[in-house]
Amino acid sequence: MNTFIKRPSGEREEIIYQTAQRLNMEPAAVEKDFWVCWVLRELFRSPLAHSVIFKGGTCLSKVYGLIARFSEDIDLILDWRGAEIVKEWQSSDGKVGRKKVMEALDEWNIIQVAGTILPAVQQFCGELCSASIPEKTPEVVLINYPRIFESAYIRPEIKLEIGPKAAWDPNEAHIIKPYIAEQYPHLLNDAEVMVRATSAERAFWEKVTILHAQAQRPSELPERYARHYYDVVMMARNIALKQRAYADVELLYRVASFKHYFYRAGWADYPNAKPGSMHLMPDGHIMEKLRLDYASMKAEMLPADAPSLECILGELKTLEAEVNALKPLPLHISNYPDMQP
């Protein structure tokens, strides 16, 4: 990949443009995809490799090929299992204890991002890119790369969103490649990137429980949440993945239990995010916002043949019925906080 970076800018511009033409994508998206893969390669070659796991939309797209939307950022789980805060978490009890743990965990994360993550990123970026922490988001590292192509909505920066409030297991090792290497393998013969990522089954149940929570939301849908509805349906279209997820209902319980502790909100109703009481269909009061958000996302981030929102909702209704028809299990804790009120 470094050989490609060292090519004259005119050659890189032509290769990126031709790749974009083949894939019917914007050149700026192909260019950013290259730099996302480069950052991931350097990240998982660095001393940080054993401290982070790749997750989120970019992971679903690049690692598993489950979604077709262009994802720009890199979501990372930061391992806190060996941190002192674990003892406090394990002994915490009640609302006050949980709040103390959340505050301590947020503080620990900010310290790790500034003291460990940023220096390591700056080290591998060298003079190629610049890395910094935005003042208002201390849990984020922004990497600015040297762009060739301009875009109205694709920023020439990669956002590393780092946080410990996600389960470490199950995870898997995978190899990814930038779009350029897939189209012109002879030009990037060192483009294979090894990453460690959240399992697709866990990602499926994570997304499903997001929709369950949104179905109970008393207020308006947050910005950019239409992507979760699209992602769930695209993942469910992968029959093999869906069958594996359905065969591991215990994992759903663990996901819901974890969220009930770390992302507790009375209206989210995570204790009922299980077979027999799962809700995935959006409530009427968020539909208008969902329609606008989906239309915007479809125009900017989805391929031309992306399904309509009506199609998404139709498949979601079927999925809701399927999940509710699964056999419920006794509540399983397995080293995660319980779901008691």
Sequence positions of predicted segments:
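Structured mid-to-C-terminal alpha-helical surface segments
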Residues: 1-52, 64-68, 79-341
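Glycine-rich beta-strand-to-loop/alpha-helix junction loops that act as flexible
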Residues: 54-58
